[in-house]
Every structure is written in structure tokens, then in C-alpha cells.
């Protein structure tokens, strides 16, 4: 893991790929973390929030800027990011219940009481960063089964090494009753938002962009949303 100082905090990278922008004060990271934080803000989970993959706590600065005070249960096998977070953002540590553990084993031991689960795992491979294989097969049904009634899953996806991006993504969406997709101008990531009932695509897009503009994130104007399921996807 390479750690570089930035104007607002630290940048964590592997093999030249940025893993996380860790701000030490409330505000935007201008990265995918802003969208993940924005979704937590606009979806307004009232109960438990789970985060699989901590990435140095990059979501905390935009969450604080958005006024979100909810605590999250976070799990990761790599302790380096959490230790950096504790050292550089001590006032935010109380907002995170972190555990070093395998995400699948940890989630299997949890009750089905999550209002929202964010899947944000990644692994380095051959000079790049990819999603682990469990993202595409083991985790989607497990996450679905650990959601409370009305709970929503948020998957931060990257193209798999062997291709099959569209097929795998749509297969994941079909495990849920309703799904939306967020894509980016700046990143190859896609964010899948899925559950029994997800806000309509226009409503979700409007709320998400408003939240991002509130904190001054450049991503407010660089995202697109659409409905994944249905005979004719709606783009907004």
C-alpha cells in the first residue's frame, strides 16, 4: 500500500491505482466514495448499516459533510486502512465499529437486520485492482438474505478480469426485486443499488445529485442513473 499526502489528507493506492482518498476534514473526495456516501444520505437507513471493505474510511468525510451521523459496522481483512483512519481522523472513530474479518464469514454470522449494506471490497492483481470472485457469486444472495424488510444493497462494481460485465451485473440485479445502476464519466466503476423497493430512477438521481452538489463534489455532474430491470431501461 502506497500512502501519499494530499491537500486535504491522504491518498491510498496500490500498483498506481487509487484505493481511497482519506480526507481529514468534512468534505468531498471527488471520487466514488462521494456517491456511496450520497446514497447512504438519500436512502436514509434508520437501522443498521454494514460496509464490506473499509478502504481507509474514505466515505466518512463526505458523510460528515452531508450531516449523516449514523454509525456503520465495517469489516476488512486489511488493518492498514483502519489504522490510518484512527490515527488521522480520531474524532470520527466513534462512527465506525470496525472488525478485522473475512467478509463472508462475518456476514454469515450476522442477523438479517441491516437496513443498508455497502459492498466495497477490492483486491490487487497483476498491476490493477479488481473485485474478488465472491462479489459475483457468494455475496449477492448472502447480502440479500441479511437485509431487513425494505433494506437496500449497494454494490461498488468493477469490470471482472475475464469479462462478462453485463451478464454478471444483470444476474446480480435479478436476485433483487428492484435495481438501479449508477455509472460514471471518470471511473469504470458501476454502482448497483438493489432491494425490494428502490426509489424511482428520476427521484433517486435528483436526490443524489442534490446531495453531491451540497458538498461541492464534482461527481454531481458526472454520473448517470438508469433502471437495470424491465424491457426498456429508463435513463436519467
Q: Where in the sequence are the language-model features?
A:
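A generic structural signal for alpha->beta connector loops
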Residues: 69-71, 93-95, 150, 176-178, ...
Amino acid at each position: 500500500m502506497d500512502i501519499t499526502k494530499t491537500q486535504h489528507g491522504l491518498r491510498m493506492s496500490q500498483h498506481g491505482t487509487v484505493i481511497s482518498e482519506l480526507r481529514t476534514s468534512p468534505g468531498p473526495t471527488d471520487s466514488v466514495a462521494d456517491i456511496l456516501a450520497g446514497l447512504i444520505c438519500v436512502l436514509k437507513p434508520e437501522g443498521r448499516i454494514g460496509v464490506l471493505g473499509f478502504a481507509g474510511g474514505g466515505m466518512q468525510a463526505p458523510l460528515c459533510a452531508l450531516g449523516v451521523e449514523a454509525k456503520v459496522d465495517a469489516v476488512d481483512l486489511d488493518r492498514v486502512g483502519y489504522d490510518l483512519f484512527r490515527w488521522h481522523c480520531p474524532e470520527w472513530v466513534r462512527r465506525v465499529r470496525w472488525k478485522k474479518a473475512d467478509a463472508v464469514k462475518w456476514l454469515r454470522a450476522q442477523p438479517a437486520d441491516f437496513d443498508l449494506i455497502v459492498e466495497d471490497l477490492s483486491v490487487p492483481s497483476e498491476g490493477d485492482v479488481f473485485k474478488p470472485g465472491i462479489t459475483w457469486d457468494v455475496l449477492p444472495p448472502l447480502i440479500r438474505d441479511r437485509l431487513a424488510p425494505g433494506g437496500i444493497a449497494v454494490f461498488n462494481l468493477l469490470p471482472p478480469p475475464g469479462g462478462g460485465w453485463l451478464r454478471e451485473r444483470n444476474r446480480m440485479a435479478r436476485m433483487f426485486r428492484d435495481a438501479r445502476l449508477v455509472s460514471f464519466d471518470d471511473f469504470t466503476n458501476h454502482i448497483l443499488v438493489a432491494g425490494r423497493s428502490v426509489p424511482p430512477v428520476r427521484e433517486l438521481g435528483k436526490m443524489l445529485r442534490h446531495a453531491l452538489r451540497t458538498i461541492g463534489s464534482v461527481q454531481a455532474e458526472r454520473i448517470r442513473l438508469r433502471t437495470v430491470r424491465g424491457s426498456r431501461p429508463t435513463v436519467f
